């Protein structure tokens, strides 16, 4: 996720306490954007042969970042939480979220 931080202007890393209690990792402004955000950039983890990322309703992050092979996919944390609360499901795939959430941003990785 260090590569994602390179996409931010003047990034500020969260303290250990902020990571644990507020559940965000870095604050910064995407280059060519005008508003700073707190990003949850925790990586996906392999669990039962699935890549997953656990979200938390108490998160103080503004945006949640998912890394794929070729892209960074960013969702609005509040909208994501509201969507999760509105369903009976606990597992969601990226395509479903892209189709059902209005705020998302896809950034292609540049090597």
Regions found by a protein language model. Give the residues of each.
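Acidic-basic catalytic patches of nuclease active cores, encompassing PD-(D/E)XK
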Residues: 1-20, 30-33
């Amino acid at each position: 996720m260090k590569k994602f931080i390179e996409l931010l202007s003047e990034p500020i890393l969260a303290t250990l306490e902020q990571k644990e209690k507020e559940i965000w990792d870095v604050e910064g402004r995407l280059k060519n954007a005008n508003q700073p955000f707190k990003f949850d950039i925790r990586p996906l983890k392999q669990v039962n042969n699935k890549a997953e990322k656990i979200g938390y309703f108490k998160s103080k992050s503004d945006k949640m970042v998912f890394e794929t092979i070729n892209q960074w996919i960013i969702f609005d944390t509040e909208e994501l939480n509201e969507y999760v609360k509105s369903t009976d499901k606990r597992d969601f795939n990226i395509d479903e979220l892209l189709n059902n959430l209005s705020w998302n941003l896809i950034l292609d990785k540049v090597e």
